[in-house]
Amino acid sequence: PKVIPSDEETKFYKGPNNDRLPDMRDAMKALGGRPACTDDLGHFPAEGDELRAAGAIVGVHNYEKLNTIHGTHHPMLMRFITSNDFGNFGEMILPAGGYGPRCSDPDKHGGDGCLYCVNGPITVNLNELEESYVLQEGDSFFLPAGTSYQLVNFEAGPIKAVFGITEL
């Protein structure tokens, strides 16, 4: 593009200006089977009470996941499979670094969370505790509510973790 929008003009996961930018859910409904967008966080693939009332079981194919970017200084792809009052479940994909390791922007959640290392190893920095843990493929990690953390990729290729978070 000729002009790259600034952080203030961009909607992204936990973006500080998301509430001031237009909600695209209604605008995109006219597209029919529209792709999920950042505005769908907390409502994807549908409202939890709607799913419970219908007794619905909903499959989410790989191409239907809600893709959003976490962070602007150290961006990481987040692919949500579900995000509603049931909880939040998906994948975090952190690309390889450039001149050094790649770190995600720090994050913390209102509810408990867990990580499962699919492709690693993944280093989990607990910023406020000044501790680090290395997850090998198949390892899991519990994050109590309010724990500040970031993921670090020391590898030459992308790393991937599956996450479950009760409250973003």
Where are these regions (language model features)?
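A short, N-terminal "cap"/entry segment at the start of jelly-roll beta-barrel domains
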Residues: K2-G90
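Conserved metal-binding segment of the jelly-roll/cupin
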Residues: A96, L126-E128, L135-E155, I165-T166
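Conserved short histidine dyad/triad with adjacent acidic residue
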Residues: H73-M78, N88-G110, S132, A145-G146, ...
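Conserved GNAT-family N-acetyltransferase fold
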Residues: M92, L115, F141
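A generic fold-level signal
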Residues: N84-F86, H109, A156
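Glycine-rich GHKL/ HATPase_c ATP-binding element in histidine kinases
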Residues: I159
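A short beta-strand-loop-beta hairpin characteristic of the jelly-roll/cupin
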Residues: P101-S104, K108-E137
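Non-cytosolic beta-sheet module surface loops
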Residues: T82, D105-D107, N153
